[in-house]
Amino acid sequence: MAKKLYIKTHGCQMNEYDSARMADLLKTGEAVEVTDNADDADILLLNTCSIREKAQEKVFHQLGRWKSLKTKKPDLIIGVGGCVASQEGQAIIDRAPYVDMVFGPQTLHRLPDMITEVRTKGNGVGVVDVSFPEIEKFDNLPEPGADGPSAFVSIMEGCSKYCTFCVVPYTRGEEVSRPVDDVIAEVAHLAAQGVREVNLLGQNVNAYRGETHDGDQMDLAELIEVIATIDGIDRIRYTTSHPVEFSDALIEVYERVPELVSHLHLPVQSGSDRILAAMKRGHTALEYKSKLRRLRKIRPDISFSSDFIIGFPGETDKDFEDTMKLINDIGFDMSFSFIYSARPGTPASDLPDDTPMEVKKQRLSILQDRLNQNVMDISRKMVGSTQRILVTGLSKKDPGEYAGRTENNRIVNFRHENPEVVGHFIDVEIVEAYPNSLRGVPVSSELF
């Protein structure tokens, strides 16, 4: 009888990709089927994120809920992976001895061996592997299975920027790029399964420098041009980018590759040069704006989104005003924003912070109100326009409708008579705008 696997994922798109690969790996190695119900599982995996405040407590809170399942089912295997696992290692098992194994983002390919070791040793002997074997995991993962017409493809791991607030270099290691041929093979394999859109992933994806078969190197701009030639791939996205690595070559590729969507997520974190320097971001607000303006000249319809940290240590009213000015100047679309929380072991965690939490919350509210207004303004301007959307499946709100995404990542709900519309592009007229979605009407029955 097949063992049942349940995976709970916290955090970023990279973690979503890693969780999917864990499932692929375990389904290939033994008789395993994925379940949506933790109560039914024989193997429970928690893929963790350490970016936000109290990440560790969130992990132990979830593990506490699983402890009772272990009591009822002693042979149940519980594993913790991801960035909190990389940070905490053995400390997770010390605090939660019912956890059987702890593994980092770079060692998830060793899961089958770890599970075998747990079964051999029996309960009470935790297995920990949070080493950094660079790109080894990709050499030991099975070919990915497609799950719909859009897919994530990890092209690099880690970050070497060491921004003062960020824990990523300590949990995922230095930047390591996958070889070009490996990336191309994975994208081609997904395309053969009906994938029409790929989202290239990396903690600092535009720092990609992949080795070619002849020992040369290829950057992200060149990789995008190659991927665009793969039959069946009609949309390309990438995330997450760093402004310093947003090169002239990458800007220019938007002029040559129509498959590259007219949307860019480029985290800036702050609009204050003083705060950017304290964060060790390596650029000014003006340098950031100049790159986006160059890109907008090439793609006038492009939309931009970003990440913003509010209340970084020492942030003054003037610093916050500079951030709001940047938001107003650029007109950011859907973006992420949150109050700064110190991550253990990062340089910023040692900085004095005398800004009251109430002030930080007020600033965040002002910023989010402005961003939400931008989102609605952009959505309303889309009403009456014709948008080509990739149909991803049934609508989550109404199973009698279908849903798809625009280039600028808007969800569009619409009705259609042909069930074969899923996995295809169609043209729809946008007729209504809502806070989190759009409503569309197909302009023809033609599928692309």
Curated annotation (Swiss-Prot):
MTTase N-terminal domain residues: 3-120
Q: Give a single Pfam family match.
A: Radical_SAM
Q: Which GO terms describe its cellular component?
A: cytosol
Would the keyword ATP-binding be found if you checked this record's keyword annotation?
no
Binding residues annotated for [4Fe-4S] cluster 2, in chain numbering: C159, C163, C166
- InterPro entries, sorted: Elp3/MiaA/NifB-like_rSAM (IPR006638), Methylthiotransferase (IPR005839), Methylthiotransferase_CS (IPR020612), Methylthiotransferase_N (IPR013848), Methylthiotransferase_N_sf (IPR038135), MiaB_methiolase (IPR006463), rSAM (IPR007197), rSAM_horseshoe (IPR023404)
Q: Where does [4Fe-4S] cluster 1 bind?
A: C12, C49, C83
Q: How is the cofactor bound?
A: Binds 2 [4Fe-4S] clusters. One cluster is coordinated with 3 cysteines and an exchangeable S-adenosyl-L-methionine.
The answer to keyword tRNA processing applying to this record is yes
Query: GO MF terms on file?
Result: 4 iron, 4 sulfur cluster binding; metal ion binding; N6-isopentenyladenosine methylthiotransferase activity
Cellular localisation: Cytoplasm
Keywords, alphabetical? 4Fe-4S, Cytoplasm, Iron, Iron-sulfur, Metal-binding, S-adenosyl-L-methionine, Transferase, tRNA processing
- Please tell me which top-level EC class this enzyme sits in: transferase
User: What are the Radical SAM core domain coordinates in residue numbering?
Assistant: 145-377
Domain of life from the UniProt record? Bacteria
Provide the E.C. number(s) assigned to this enzyme.
2.8.4.3
Looking at the record, the residues that make up the TRAM domain are 380-444
Tell me which cofactor or cofactors this protein depends on. [4Fe-4S] cluster
Which reactions appear under catalytic activity for this entry?
A: N(6)-dimethylallyladenosine(37) in tRNA + (sulfur carrier)-SH + AH2 + 2 S-adenosyl-L-methionine = 2-methylsulfanyl-N(6)-dimethylallyladenosine(37) in tRNA + (sulfur carrier)-H + 5'-deoxyadenosine + L-methionine + A + S-adenosyl-L-homocysteine + 2 H(+)
Q: What does this protein do?
A: Catalyzes the methylthiolation of N6-(dimethylallyl)adenosine (i(6)A), leading to the formation of 2-methylthio-N6-(dimethylallyl)adenosine (ms(2)i(6)A) at position 37 in tRNAs that read codons beginning with uridine.
Q: How does it assemble?
A: Monomer.
Tell me which family the UniProt entry assigns to this protein. Belongs to the methylthiotransferase family. MiaB subfamily.
Q: What is this protein called?
A: tRNA-2-methylthio-N(6)-dimethylallyladenosine synthase
Q: What is the lineage of its organism?
A: Bacteria, Pseudomonadati, Pseudomonadota, Gammaproteobacteria, Pseudomonadales
